[in-house]
Swiss-Prot record:
Tissue: Red blood cells.
Biological-process GO terms, alphabetical: hydrogen peroxide catabolic process
Protein name, per record: Hemoglobin subunit alpha
Coiled-coil stretches noted in the UniProt entry, renumbered to this chain: none
Annotated S-S bridges: none
Complexes and interactors: Heterotetramer of two alpha chains and two beta chains.
Similarity field: Belongs to the globin family.
Gene Ontology cellular-component annotations: blood microparticle; haptoglobin-hemoglobin complex; hemoglobin complex
The protein's role, per its UniProt record: Involved in oxygen transport from the lung to the various peripheral tissues.
Binding residues annotated for heme b, in chain numbering: H87
Gene from which the chain derives: HBA
Residue ranges of every copy of the Globin domain listed in the record: 1-142
UniProt superkingdom: Eukaryota
Length: 142
């Protein structure tokens, strides 16, 4: 559960992400594909080379979903219900992959947000947020 301080930290960090959400989403995906090559199996039809249009487009989707989630911190299950259905029933993504992407998102944000703004407290709040999003996205697997 996100505390009031966590919610403020997440919203504050995401304000700084702003229009870069899709770009950072794509960078995190590339990082995930390089660091955890088994994740590529869910994208057999994608060109996974650096800067590919398909990875950029999917990064935009990731960024948009996270932006939506930030706007609905008190109701993530309803806000992400459609994505939960998609990933559980149609795409059948192994739940561990959400943890891998979450890690790559944290690394990406740590690279782009200024050090004085990506504090340990903000890092912890974003980690909790990504964990909550992952939990919601895997909730319909059960």
């Amino acid at each position: 559960v996100l505390s009031a301080a966590d919610k403020n930290n997440v919203k504050g960090a995401w304000e700084k992400v702003g229009t870069h959400a899709g770009e950072y989403g794509a960078e995190a995906l590339e990082r995930m594909f390089l660091s955890f090559p088994t994740t590529k199996t869910y994208f057999p039809h994608f060109d996974l080379t650096h800067g590919s249009a398909q990875v950029k487009a999917h990064g935009q989707k990731v960024g948009a979903a996270l932006t939506k989630a930030v706007g609905h911190l008190d109701d993530l299950p309803n806000a992400l219900s459609d994505l939960s259905d998609l990933h559980a029933h149609k795409l059948r993504v192994d739940p561990v992959n959400f943890k891998l992407l979450s890690h790559c998102l944290l690394v990406t944000l740590s690279r782009h947000l200024p050090e004085q703004e990506f504090t340990p407290a903000v890092h912890a709040s974003l980690d909790k947020f990504f964990s909550n999003v992952s939990t919601v996205l895997t909730s319909k697997y059960r």
